[in-house]
């Protein structure tokens, strides 16, 4: 073993296996790029992103932890969301929930 070496089991790591997902079309109507991180409550993202917000309540991007999706001005893309898990309490972000989902 080399100091700091990480030994992982063989095979692929599957994220969010068995969790329900939804697909949404999202467009950036603003004049600046918007980047959304993997665990940001998607319901509370920048208001320049246009999509069905109610469907995104309690959801986050279905992407690896620590990564993000970037929306350039005028961009429209389909994203996949998964439910936030754990206590299903959301605090901070844009203060639209600040409590139980």
UniProtKB/Swiss-Prot annotation:
Its EC number(s): 3.5.1.5
Single GO term (MF): urease activity
Main location: cytoplasm
Subunit field text: Heterotrimer of UreA (gamma), UreB (beta) and UreC (alpha) subunits. Three heterotrimers associate to form the active enzyme.
Record GO biological process: urea catabolic process
UniProt keyword annotations, A-Z: Cytoplasm, Hydrolase
Record organism: Nostoc punctiforme (strain ATCC 29133 / PCC 73102)
NCBIfam families from the UniProt entry: PRK13203.1, urease_beta
Keyword field contains Transmembrane helix: no
Subcellular locations according to the entry: Cytoplasm
Protein name listed in UniProt: Urease subunit beta
Gene: ureB
Biochemical pathway: Nitrogen metabolism; urea degradation; CO(2) and NH(3) from urea (urease route): step 1/1
GO CC terms of this entry: urease complex
UniProt catalytic activity: urea + 2 H2O + H(+) = hydrogencarbonate + 2 NH4(+)
Transmembrane segments: none
